[in-house]
Amino acid sequence: MNAKVWVLGDAVVDLLPESEGRLLQCPGGAPANVAVGVARLGGNSGFIGAVGGDPFGRYMRHTLQQEQVDVSHMYLDDQHRTSTVVVDLDDQGERTFTFMVRPSADLFLVEEDLPQFAAGQWLHVCSIALSAEPSRSTTFAAMESIRSAGGRVSFDPNIRPDLWQDQALLLACLDRALHMANVVKLSEEELVFISSSNDLAYGIASVTERYQPELLLVTRGKAGVLAAFQQKFTHFNARPVASVDTTGAGDAFVAGLLASLAANGMPTDMTALEPTLTLAQTCGALATTAKGAMTALPYQRDLNRQF
């Protein structure tokens, strides 16, 4: 079993700080990173989205194609530009983002661009695709379509507040997406935002009760991962590494998670979930040991050295 993992959203050119004020061009965008991450782990991934019919867009499509991602539903839009983001790193390798193109081509995806989903497949989405029309309606349609076909939805909000002028709309979109997701991955900050509580145990209980995902994961960086699964709650320790750049850590974690779930199916209990989370955490940790998001995503051979 190696079910297809579709990833819908933005493919972005990240501009990362280099020496003497120079910027390094790197392929990125959380959905594109996840699609590549799954493919590098031997999974079957496809990207659904639009990039500009410009040099950056052609570069991103070529990059994903070279990484063995199915790009048959990755479109070049001559009317709009590819999303471009300046990433700023602090001394600890933590980052902030400045979006240079708005609205970018990815936000103009329409329902006619969607593939025919099939039973057993996965669809992974983030909230940037929900931040504007027509992408918002297209994303919700994709989530409904794959669930109707017998597939599952994975949702990582990956909230970027500066892309939302209306916080009430952000909350409404998050609420709708969370109701449709089988697997939810949140950062600690996102859990606090969604649950309106700094108490993580309360926040997890609140989210699981309201949305009832099959699996809820809360990533806490060096503090590990909290998991709520089959009415049980547990903590998994992080793998200690020397971090250089955290840009792609969350995406690598999701890629490892989805690659394992697509290959092995949903675990039957918390004990069976442990190898999947170990793989996901190892992917996330390895991705912080090099600069860039996509460039740092691990290959299967990198994992083989870890186990």
From Swiss-Prot:
Catalysed reaction equations from the record: D-fructose + ATP = D-fructose 6-phosphate + ADP + H(+)
UniProt cross-references to Pfam families, sorted A to Z: PfkB
Keywords, alphabetical: ATP-binding, Carbohydrate metabolism, Kinase, Nucleotide-binding, Plasmid, Transferase
- Documented EC number(s): 2.7.1.4
The record, for InterPro entries, names: Carboh/pur_kinase_PfkB_CS (IPR002173), PfkB_Carbo_kinase (IPR050306), PfkB_dom (IPR011611), Ribo/fructo_kinase (IPR002139), Ribokinase-like (IPR029056)
Record PROSITE patterns: PFKB_KINASES_1, PFKB_KINASES_2
- Which EC class heads this enzyme's classification? transferase
| GO terms for MF | ATP binding; fructokinase activity
Q: Is the keyword Metal-binding in the record?
A: no
Swiss-Prot/TrEMBL GO biological process terms:
fructose metabolic process
Q: Which SUPFAM superfamilies match?
A: Ribokinase-like (SSF53613)
Similarity comment text for this entry: Belongs to the carbohydrate kinase PfkB family.
Task: Report what the protein is called.
Answer: Fructokinase
Species per Swiss-Prot/TrEMBL record: Salmonella typhimurium
